[in-house]
Each structure stands twice: as structure tokens, then as C-alpha cells.
Swiss-Prot record:
The gene is ZCCHC4. A zinc finger (CCHC-type) spans 443-460. Belongs to the ZCCHC4 family. Zn(2+) 5 binds at residues 411, 414, 424, 431. It is an enzyme of class 2 (transferase). Residues 487-496 have a biased composition (Polar residues). This is rRNA N(6)-adenosine-methyltransferase ZCCHC4. Residues 337-357 are annotated as: Regulatory loop. Changing residue 340 to A: Strongly impaired rRNA methyltransferase activity. Its main location: nucleus.
Length: 513
């Protein structure tokens, strides 16, 4: 499931290596991990801080992990804010109201009853996106209802369900059949027997469909996805309602144990995780979640296998490469362009933006992964990997350097290959688009300005945090002083008013006497 924000450019700007605007939002780890984060309808919230270049950090706050738009989840709480019992009770009630109308057990029971119905009685409400039992028909008589739902249709729920379209929260861009079939064939060729599908519903259903139609295929799949609608199509051992931004299982320990058992089956052998997160999501919380899944997998490993890594395919735009490799240094990016059915830009060929920017990041050696030559991929002997047709090997860089599928040009001044549309700017002293602003947003670290790292990994971050803490304390003292002066002024005003009142009373008594 891939999500876009307000257009391709916004996502590319956020993911570009080292490219930082005048401000940004970062996820921070709480000082005391033992203190649980407050809950919103999507599980534990994340702690954020706004960072502005040249200015200090502002007050930290908790917000929803899954929703980038306050209209979708308006949770907001300052880190140091104390809530009353009434507000906490109201929040808990709101969180309960926002949960799916049916429990996981109820969904399974309804599904088992549904598949036993004759074809003429199998109905699906397209308005409510729900499988209907005969007792439900009356409540949906005014809705748009699809009849004669076949078993084949039940096995392809991603084609029955309308894709969620909120771009900032959970927009669903589903793998095109070409890319999905390539992934299934590749997983089979690499010898994997189990696939943990994190946010990849179409891959999950194609794996199950292939297994049901091909006796030679023994690949099993478990889907973890935030879209609870899939719970009505799968048994408990095939689907878990899950938020990948905070590692939250909506159905609690039962679902967690399903995932754990799947990861640790056969002592963790023969499994791979394939994930397709929303592109608008922050890389850091995703990396933290994936490391928790890796740790769960490692629990089933013997001491001799402690050096092994869980094989992973992380499907994401190529301009997030530096961010992903920051958290997973063993990952490499493949040239394969992943397509999506319902996205006008993320498509293979020349119908999309500059062909699909979506790639596969993996810790599997690239020389083991064969890309389809009929789609224009070729093997580069010096690089020992498959590359796209126009990705030419650069002798100076000793690499096939293109990231976007076009032929890149080597810049002798920058000492690296750059996009064909870029030119070298003598003012900026690096290559950039021809119409760029030389006085535009600076690149690099917010703290020291260096280009080779982010603020979170800056060697000067401790000094910066001490300075920020001192500034916050100074601001707090100033705020407290202003409050005291205001209170003092109000007290003095009250005293003066009391004195005036007493003087008037004495004057009235004097005049009356």
C-alpha cells in the first residue's frame, strides 16, 4: 500500500538525500521508554518536535503515528501536558467509538457463514464495503449492492474493495499485476516458503491464489495492514489489523502471537518480509517498527544463527535511499521499477512521470536477483547486478549510477554522476537544476550545516541539546516571571479596589452621621 501526499514533488522534496527546507518535523524517542505514549484510535502516538534551521527546538508534542492530516486524526497533546480524569475518560470513549464495528472473531464467523451461502445469496455492499449475510439485507436495501459474489472474487478482495483515497493518511496504490507477478516469481525462485506482507494486500492475495491453484507452490503468507476491511476476507492466521508506524496490533496479544508464530516457524528459516509503506510516512518510525519485527524473528534463532539477517524487500521511492540506508546499512537499491494499478504517475514506461520512481531496497545480494530482460533489464558484469537499459556503467565512478532509469552524466567538478537535466552551478559549487535559486534552502544538517549527515546523527547534537535546554529553561523562567507579575498586578488591583470600597463606606457613614 503506497500513499502519496500533495503530489509527487512534495514527497520527493522530503525524501531527497540531505535536502532540507527552512523547517522540518522529526520523531524523537521519549526520555523514559517505560512511560507509555498516549493512545489515539490508531494506537500509541509518536513524539514529535519541530526543528528550524538557525532556531532552537520548540515544545515537543504527541500526535497520531498514521495520519499526517489533523482532519483524519486530531490527536494533539504536549509532552508535559497534564490531563484531567474527565478528559482522559472522554479520550478513551472516543478511541473505542473509532474502532471497527465488528471484532476479529465476528468477522471470521461471518466469513465462514458467507462462503456456505449459495451464489445467488452472496452479496457485497459497495456503499458500506461489507459482505452481507441474509439478515443484513434489509439494512442495506437503499445501498449499492453487488450480487453473485464468487469464490474467485472473494480471493481477490483488493478488487472488491474501493481503494482508500486520502493521500495524507492511507491512500492505497495497489501493485500492478506485472509487478505483483514478478515479485511472486522472484520470491519462489529465491526459495522462500513464507512471506510476511506488511502493507502489501495485493501481493498477499496473489500468493494465496497461486498456492490454491498450484500444488507445487508451498509459499504461505501473512498480511499485516491498517485497513481493517480485509479482516472480513481472511482467517486469523492470514491477516492482522496492524499499524506499521507504531508496531501496534489492534487485536492485542492474540494477533501479536499470530505474527510471532509465523516469523519463528521452522526456526525462522525460509521467510522474507515484503513491505510497501505509505510514501508520505516518515522513515524513522518505519525503521523502528521493522527492527522490532526483526527482533521478534531473532527470538526464534539459535545462538549460532545470531549473525543472520531477516531478508527484507522494502518498496519505496529511490529518493529515500540515503534515509533507508542510514537505518539499514546492508540494504541496496535494485533498478526494478515497481508499478501501481491506480496511480497515474507511478507507472512503468513513458505514461507516468519519468517512469515509476518506486524501487526495491533489500539486504539480499543483488547478484542473486534476476530482473526480467524482456522488460529491458540487463546484467552489468563489473557491478555484478541487473540494471535498467539506460543505466550505463561509469568507469570513473566504477558503478552504474542512475537512480531514475535515465542515463546520468558524469560531472568532473562534482566528481560524481548527476541527472541529465542538471548543470554545474559555480555559485553553489555543485550541480543543480538550471532554474534553481542559489539562495534557496540550504542542504545538510540543521545543527552544523554539513552535507553528509542529518541533525539526528550530528556529532554536535549533545552540545545543541544542552543549549536548547538552557534556552527552554530561560524561556520558562521568563514565562513564570510574567505570570507572577500578572498575578501580583491582579492582587494589587484587588487590594486597591478593596481600599477604595472601604473609604467610600466610611465616607457614607460620616455623611450619614
Amino acid at each position: 500500500m503506497a500513499a502519496s501526499r500533495n503530489g509527487f514533488e512534495a514527497v520527493e522534496a522530503e525524501g531527497s538525500a540531505g535536502c532540507r527546507g527552512s523547517s522540518g518535523m522529526e520523531v524523537v524517542l521519549p526520555l523514559d521508554p517505560a512511560v507509555p505514549a498516549p493512545l489515539c484510535p490508531h494506537g500509541p502516538t509518536l513524539l514529535f518536535v519541530k526543528v528550524t534551521q538557525g532556531k532552537e527546538e520548540t515544545r515537543r508534542f504527541y500526535a497520531c503515528s498514521a495520519c499526517r492530516d489533523r482532519k483524519d486524526c486530531n490527536f494533539f497533546q504536549w509532552e508535559d501536558e497534564k490531563l484531567s480524569g474527565a478528559r482522559l475518560a472522554a479520550r478513551e470513549a472516543h478511541n473505542r467509538r473509532c474502532q471497527p464495528p465488528l471484532s476479529r472473531t465476528q468477522c471470521v464467523e461471518r466469513y465462514l457463514k458467507f462462503i456456505e451461502l449459495p451464489l445467488t445469496q452472496r452479496k457485497f455492499c459497495q456503499t458500506c464495503q461489507q459482505l452481507l449475510l441474509p439478515d443484513d439485507w434489509g439494512q442495506h436495501s437503499e445501498h449499492q449492492v453487488l450480487g453473485n459474489v464468487s469464490i474467485t472474487q472473494l480471493r481477490r478482495p483488493s478488487q472488491l474493495l474501493y481503494p482508500l483515497e486520502n493521500k495524507k493518511t492511507n491512500a492505497q496504490y495497489l501493485f500492478a499485476d506485472r509487478s505483483c507477478q514478478f515479485l511472486v516469481d522472484l520470491l519462489s525462485a529465491l526459495g522462500f516458503r513464507r512471506v510476511l506482507c506488511v502493507g502489501t494486500p495485493r501481493l498477499h492475495e496473489l500468493i494465496k491464489l497461486t498456492a490454491s491453484g498450484d500444488k507445487k507452490s508451498n509459499i504461505k503468507s501473512l498480511l499485516l495492514d491498517i485497513d481493517f476491511r480485509y479482516s472480513q476476507f481472511y482467517m486469523e492466521d492470514s491477516f492482522c489489523h496492524y499499524n506499521m508506524f507504531n508496531h501496534h496490533f489492534f487485536d492485542g496479544k492474540t494477533a501479536l502471537e499470530v505474527c510471532r508464530a509465523f516469523l519463528q516457524e521452522d526456526k525462522g528459516e525460509g521467510i522474507i518480509m515484503v513491505t510497501d509503506p505509505p510514501f508520505g510516512g516518515l522513515v524513522e518510525p518505519l525503521a523502528i517498527t521493522f527492527k522490532k519485527l526483526i527482533a521478534m524473528w531473532k527470538e526464534g534463532q539459535s545462538q549460532d544463527d545470531s549473525h543472520k539477517e531477516l531478508p527484507i524487500f522494502w518498496i519505496f521511492p529511490y529518493f529515500f535511499e540515503s534515509r533507508i540506508c542510514q537505518f539499514f546499512p546492508s540494504f541496496q537499491m535494485l533498478d526494478y521499477q515497481v508499478d501501481y494499478d491506480n496511480h497515474a504517475l507511478y507507472k512503468h514506461g513513458k505514461t507516468g512521470r519519468k517512469q515509476s520512481p518506486v524501487r526495491i531496497f533489500t539486504n539480499i545480494p543483488p547478484n542473486k536477483i534476476i530482473l526480467p530482460t524482456e522488460e529491458g533489464y540487463r546484467f552489468c558484469s563489473p557491478c555484478q547486478r541487473y540494471v535498467s537499459l539506460e543505466n550505463q556503467h561509469c568507469e570513473l565512478c566504477n558503478s552504474c549510477t542512475s537512480k531514475d532509469g535515465r542515463k546520468w552524466n558524469h560531472c568532473f567538478l562534482c566528481k560524481k554522476c548527476v541527472k541529465p537535466s542538471w548543470i554545474h552551478c559555480s555559485i553553489c559549487n555543485h550541480c543543480a537544476v538550471p532554474d534553481h535559486s542559489c539562495e534557496g534552502p540550504k542542504h545538510g544538517c540543521f545543527i552544523c550545516g554539513e552535507l553528509d549527515h542529518k541533525r539526528s546523527t550530528c556529532p554536535n547534537i549533545a552540545t545543541s541539546k544542552r543549549a536548547n535546554k538552557a534556552v527552554r529553561k530561560q524561556k520558562q523562567r521568563k514565562s513564570n516571571k510574567m505570570k507572577m507579575e500578572t498575578t501580583k498586578g491582579q492582587s494589587m488591583n484587588h487590594t486597591s479596589a478593596t481600599r477604595r470600597k472601604k473609604r467610600r463606606e466610611r465616607a457614607h457613614q460620616y455623611l450619614g452621621s
